[in-house]
Amino acid sequence: EGAGSGFDLGHQGLQLTMRMADGRLPDHPLRLQIWNQMGCDSHAAVKARVVQQDFGTADFAALAPLVVEAAAKNCPGAEEIVQGSAAALSRCISTVAQQLSLRSPLVVCHGGAVTHLQGFRTAVQQAIHQSIPEARWGKAKGDACDGALLMAEALTLRPR
């Protein structure tokens, strides 16, 4: 599952623009913003662009800031994407906290959309607060490898 990733936000945003283009949803300036960033001017051009070998994960992720910005400006579809992704990420965190019996977990999100997109980070923080009111939001003191090394060190130094 890609919940919370820039790729996921951008991919869903692009799907949203396709529904706008074919009339399933009302048009919004977000459609042109995303299409312009992709260098496309039509529904067909978008479909052709996404299957090109040089269009990949990073290109979808590059669309995420446009989706988050549109959500902040009350674009209904973009708001649903941001809120849905934040809720999915929150459910993942809640599940881990429950499985580990953590009552007031320290939540540290590092990298990607949570780090670089303030509007998305705020949505995630709000979703976590709703599902785990006692959760605390912390800052990363390293990357995942640093955390794994600290945990391994703690296990090896613990008296048996």
Language model features by range: what are they?
Residues 1-19:
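Hydrophobic alpha-helical segments and helix pairs
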Residues 14-160:
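ATP-binding/phosphotransfer module of carbohydrate and carboxylate kinases, centering on a glycine-rich
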